[in-house]
Amino acid sequence: MEWGPGAGWSRGEAAGVDRGKAGLGLGGRPPPQPPRDERAQQLLDAVEQRQRQLLDTIAACEEMLRQLGRRRPEPAGGGNGSAKSGAPPQPSVSARGGLPKDAGDGASES
């Protein structure tokens, strides 16, 4: 039972990774990296920059929505409803031959 979870192997050893070379680049040397604090600061700066970009994008979208709202003060549904409010929709659609039953009637007459 040497292979069980209690065999005393670390995860790196179990995966065939030599503990001394874990995370090392070619030639056994670590890849060049800035010190940990400097790297953390770089990541924090990148996150803050991305956050500013997203906030700018949101602000631009909100401005576009405001401009669209000024151009079209009436909702899209309200414009369509007011155009048809005087007549029932059924006769106007059937007069244009838009209903499937009209297409069937036309085919039987010819």
Curated annotation (Swiss-Prot):
Keywords: Coiled coil. Residues 1-41, 65-110 are annotated as: Disordered. Residues 38-68 form a coiled coil. InterPro entries: DUF4726. It comes from the Eukaryota. The keyword Coiled coil applies. This is Uncharacterized protein C1orf122 homolog. It comes from Mus musculus. The lineage of its organism: Eukaryota, Metazoa, Chordata, Craniata, Vertebrata.
